[in-house]
Amino acid sequence: MTQEMQSLALVPQGSIEAYIRAANSYPMLTAEEEKELAERLHYEGDLEAAKTLILSHLRFVIHVARSYSGYGLPQADLIQEGNIGLMKAVRHFNPEVGVRLVSFAVHWIKAEIHEYVLRNWRIVKVATTKSQRKLFFNLRKNKKRLGWFNQDEVELVAKELGVSESDVREMESRMSAQDMAFDMSADDSDDPHPVAPVLFLEDKSSDFADGIEEDNWDNHAADRLTLAIKTLDERSQDIIRARWLEDDNKSTLQELADKYGVSAERVRQLEKNAMKKLRLAIED
């Protein structure tokens, strides 16, 4: 992969608007042009052909990434993950199958973005089972109005997605509580140590004792997280704090790359490795 392709395709640099303009400046391919390039890559390993295929489809990744903007994650990161999926799709694309690259790539693009959202959305892993994943990514577009579903809507969504009505109600509750769970502060209550609602969103069958146990686990996990961060090297600690622990003005990969004099892809790798270590520390 060339330096130009890696720097543009993997990580939006500068403003999102400038990146979108650059991505849209690459011409779209005709079916004939696409097939010729795909054959050159597939049979000859032509990396210049791969570059052209990727750059001509960046606008499509932007289009897909925009549909995930409601989850509160940085648009640049969503695009970056989608671009990784696009690159994987180009590498696996067989020009003899008889479909356009865009039809083949959409599944790879969405898969990368899905995993990113599931790992990071609002910290809470609201989607842990197969049925919950399906609900997580379809519930928003199935809502016909603001507010809670009525019974007819619950039945319709459950039927469309092939899940139970109780699953629909549970996921709706979790998603509707996303802001409330993390925005509560001590000023919101006379209690100097208010219990955030997130502690009671895990399971509708939970009783109060379960909530207290969950509260204790969260405190334990927070302590383990603090200790785990201290085990990281100084650069990795800075990356995690700048990317995840700052309330405002979270740093982009490119900003951190400029700070440390490395590529944005290298920062992404360091972040990924650090996050893996932190997750393992919390789950132990």
Swiss-Prot record:
Which regions of the protein are recorded as binding DNA?
Answer: 253-272
Matches recorded under Gene3D superfamilies: 1.20.120.1810, Winged helix-like DNA-binding domain superfamily/Winged helix DNA-binding domain (1.10.10.10)
Region feature Sigma-70 factor domain-2, mapped onto this chain: 53-122
Which positions does the motif Interaction with polymerase core subunit RpoC occupy? 77-80
Keywords (A to Z) from UniProt: Cytoplasm, DNA-binding, Sigma factor, Stress response, Transcription, Transcription regulation
Task: Provide the protein's localization.
Answer: Cytoplasm
Region annotated Sigma-70 factor domain-4, chain positions: 228-280
Alphabetically, the GO molecular function entries are: DNA binding; sigma factor activity
User: What Gene Ontology cellular-component terms does the record carry?
Assistant: cytoplasm
Which Pfam family, just one, is annotated for this protein?
Sigma70_r2
Biological process terms in GO annotation:
DNA-templated transcription initiation; response to heat
Q: Which HAMAP family match?
A: Sigma70_RpoH
Q: How does it assemble?
A: Interacts with the RNA polymerase core enzyme.
Give the function comment from the record: Sigma factors are initiation factors that promote the attachment of RNA polymerase to specific initiation sites and are then released. This sigma factor is involved in regulation of expression of heat shock genes.
State the similarity comment.
Belongs to the sigma-70 factor family. RpoH subfamily.
Supply the PANTHER family for this chain. RNA POLYMERASE SIGMA FACTOR RPOH, SIGMA FACTOR RPOH HEAT SHOCK RELATED
The protein's name: RNA polymerase sigma factor RpoH
State the species of origin: Proteus mirabilis
Gene designation: rpoH
